[in-house]
């Protein structure tokens, strides 16, 4: 019996992931009581039947206030911190005696270390000039995803409204530069990319 409940819950989770919508924490920001982003004028007076936020919740910003401080809650950047052990695959060792000035130059792999071991006589001098690159390791540039432009459905005059003469916000021949239904969300989850 418990396996049936688990299968039911997992199936519900997969269905929600497949057919749900991402409206962000504050809805689609178009205001008004007919802010049905989920249905957006597919019928029923052309205003949408989803209610505010497209979920019938009624009101904007229906979540905890602390979520505004979380970068991942509105599609912002995601900070990644990674640490690893020092590389051990490259070693430079010498037991020779050098007299005079010695210069060694080259590039070691990033995240490398340098060490000088040995005894220097009082008349000699030893030193290391070691730098660790420019700090650009791995991903060097991240930009916000811009919304998809020039592919949305526009304002359709009276196609799905209650009467042919009434303007309705629905599917139509118009193409908008802002996305679906003249004020689309573009691409991305949660953040408003207008």
UniProtKB/Swiss-Prot annotation:
<dbReference type="InterPro" id="IPR002635">
    <property type="entry name" value="Chorion"/>
</dbReference>
<keyword id="KW-0732">Signal</keyword>
<dbReference type="GO" id="GO:0007304">
    <property type="term" value="P:chorion-containing eggshell formation"/>
</dbReference>
<feature type="region of interest" description="Left arm">
    <location>
        <begin position="22"/>
        <end position="72"/>
    </location>
</feature>
<feature type="region of interest" description="Central domain">
    <location>
        <begin position="73"/>
        <end position="128"/>
    </location>
</feature>
<feature type="signal peptide">
    <location>
        <begin position="1"/>
        <end position="20"/>
    </location>
</feature>
<feature type="region of interest" description="Right arm (Gly-rich tandem repeats)">
    <location>
        <begin position="129"/>
        <end position="194"/>
    </location>
</feature>
<keyword id="KW-0677">Repeat</keyword>
<dbReference type="GO" id="GO:0005213">
    <property type="term" value="F:structural constituent of egg chorion"/>
</dbReference>
<comment type="similarity">
    <text>Belongs to the chorion protein family.</text>
</comment>
<dbReference type="Pfam" id="PF01723">
    <property type="entry name" value="Chorion_1"/>
</dbReference>
<protein>
    <recommendedName>
        <fullName>Chorion class B protein ERB4</fullName>
    </recommendedName>
</protein>
<dbReference type="GO" id="GO:0042600">
    <property type="term" value="C:egg chorion"/>
</dbReference>
<comment type="function">
    <text>This protein is one of many from the eggshell of the silk moth.</text>
</comment>
């Amino acid at each position: 019996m418990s396996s049936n409940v688990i299968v039911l819950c997992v199936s519900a989770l997969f269905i929600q992931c497949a057919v749900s919508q991402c409206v962000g924490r504050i809805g689609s920001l178009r205001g008004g009581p007919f802010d049905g982003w989920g249905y957006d004028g597919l019928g029923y007076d052309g205003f949408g039947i989803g209610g505010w936020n497209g979920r019938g919740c009624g009101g904007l910003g229906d979540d905890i206030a602390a979520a505004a401080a979380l970068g991942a809650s509105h599609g912002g950047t995601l900070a990644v911190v990674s640490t690893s052990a020092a590389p051990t695959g490259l070693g430079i060792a010498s037991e020779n005696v050098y007299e005079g000035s010695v210069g060694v130059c080259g590039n070691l792999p990033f995240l490398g270390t340098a060490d000088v071991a040995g005894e220097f006589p009082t008349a000699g001098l030893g030193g290391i000039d070691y730098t660790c690159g420019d700090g650009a390791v791995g991903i060097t540039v991240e930009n916000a995803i811009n919304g998809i432009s020039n592919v949305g459905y526009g304002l359709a005059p009276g196609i799905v409204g209650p009467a042919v003469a009434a303007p309705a916000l629905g599917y139509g021949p118009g193409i908008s530069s802002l996305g679906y239904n003249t004020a689309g969300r573009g691409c991305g989850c949660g953040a408003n990319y207008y």
